[in-house]
């Protein structure tokens, strides 16, 4: 019987890390071709792909997937197990054929300053989450969320407007 094989994914040399970045269990993350801002914290089992950007003073909790084309501004909280997508037609083209690299297109997604994303959220390609917005745990975000609003549910529906003083003032 074979033993357990452990493969550690190093942090790629083409990653730009700001000052004071804390990566918990760096042998259990996969970062390549991305930018991470000053004083950001990244948990275990996080993947951040090329051409993704995380701002300053963010917290990215464990088991989170941040794909190519995602921009996360400063002071954002991302809960455990959050998944971003970047392709409107995953696995198949519009006519149903399997995609190749030639017809795959990254659709940018943005999370604005001070937003908070609960655990288990799925954020579909092309969505903008507004400044100071809060996304409830387990939501599937299919449309933009305005600044300072709550969104929750499956699919996510807009809830109440938040006070503008709930956004960090950095």
What is each model feature region?
Residues 2-16, 23-127, 154-155, 160-163, ...:
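Flexible, glycine/small-residue-enriched loop-and-beta-strand segment within the central core
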Residues 127-144, 148-150:
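C-terminal/domain-terminus segments
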